[in-house]
């Protein structure tokens, strides 16, 4: 049986968890094996900017941060299960990558 690795990436961990729960329900309904969701390391993008735009005065900095959360889900690539995975409602800020392995 083929395996499918589904990688979920996004900035909102709650929405990623919702998509993971939908994948779990699909696996339960179709009776295929599911492994995960495995949390991968969170990537932090930090951008420091000067508070004063003119360059005069005290050098104070603001730090803006964007966190990118990732989850990995493994599922058997059964035809019925994969059709239902393709129909999952995915929010705008969550991206999905599906990789099939033999």
Swiss-Prot record:
Transmembrane segments: none annotated. InterPro entries: Ribosomal_uS10, Ribosomal_uS10_CS, Ribosomal_uS10_dom, Ribosomal_uS10_dom_sf, Ribosomal_uS10_euk/arc. One of its GO terms (cellular component) is small ribosomal subunit. Keywords: Ribonucleoprotein, Ribosomal protein. The keyword Ribonucleoprotein applies. GO terms for biological process: translation. Coiled coil: none annotated. GO terms for molecular function: structural constituent of ribosome; tRNA binding. PANTHER family: 30S RIBOSOMAL PROTEIN S10 FAMILY MEMBER (PTHR11700). Involved in the binding of tRNA to the ribosomes. HAMAP family: Ribosomal_uS10 (MF_00508). Belongs to the universal ribosomal protein uS10 family. Part of the 30S ribosomal subunit. This is Small ribosomal subunit protein uS10. The gene is rps10.
């Amino acid at each position: 049986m083929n395996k499918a690795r589904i990688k979920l990436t996004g900035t909102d961990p709650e929405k990623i968890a919702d998509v993971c729960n939908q994948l779990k329900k699909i696996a339960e309904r179709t009776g295929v094996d599911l492994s995960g969701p495995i949390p991968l390391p969170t990537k932090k993008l930090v951008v420091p900017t000067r508070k004063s735009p003119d360059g005069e005065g005290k050098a104070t900095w603001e730090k803006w941060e964007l966190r990118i959360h990732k989850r990995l889900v493994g599922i058997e690539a059964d035809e019925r299960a994969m059709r239902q995975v393709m129909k999952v409602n995915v929010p705008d800020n969550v991206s999905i990558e599906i990789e099939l392995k033999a």
